[in-house]
Amino acid sequence: MKQFYIVDSSMLPEVVGKVIAARALLQNGEVKQVSEAVKQVGISRGTYYKYKDYVFLPDPEMASRKAVISLMLHHDRGILSEVLTTMSQAQASIVTINQNIPIHNWASVVMSFDISALQGTLDDLVTKLGNIRGVSDVHLVSVE
C-alpha cells in the first residue's frame, strides 16, 4: 500500500511547485503541449515527467467533513423549516435530505450535511434539534 504525506511546501524542492504549475497550465487549457508548459514555469520536460504522477495539491473537497443524522418529525407545518433554520444558523451545509411519508403523524428524516464550517459541536447541534417542538429521536448516524 502506498503511503502519502502532507508536507509544508517550504520543505520541498522548488521543482515540485513548478510541476504542479505546469500541470495546471495544461489542465486549464492555457497551453496545449507539455513543452510549452515546462518552458513557462522554467523546468525541463524530464523533470516534469519524473514528478507529474506523484505530486498533487490537496483536493478542497477532501477538506470537507460530512455528518449524517436521523430524526423523527411530527407532521405539522413548519417543523422541517425550523430544523433547516437551526442547521443553517450552525453553519451546517445540507447535502441531502430524505423524508419518508408520515405514518401515524410522524415522518422519518435522514439528513447529510457538511460540517467543515460548523459553529459549535455536533453534540450541541443534536441537542438544539432535539429541543425543537415536534422533533424527536435525533441520532448522529455517522461522521466522516
From Swiss-Prot:
Listed PROSITE patterns: ACT
Source superkingdom: Bacteria
Stretches assigned to the ACT domain: 68-143
Entries under InterPro entries matching the protein: ACT-like_dom_sf, ACT_dom, UPF0735_ACT_dom-cont
Family: Belongs to the UPF0735 family.
HAMAP family listed in its UniProt record: UPF0735
Protein name from the UniProt record: UPF0735 ACT domain-containing protein LCABL_12100
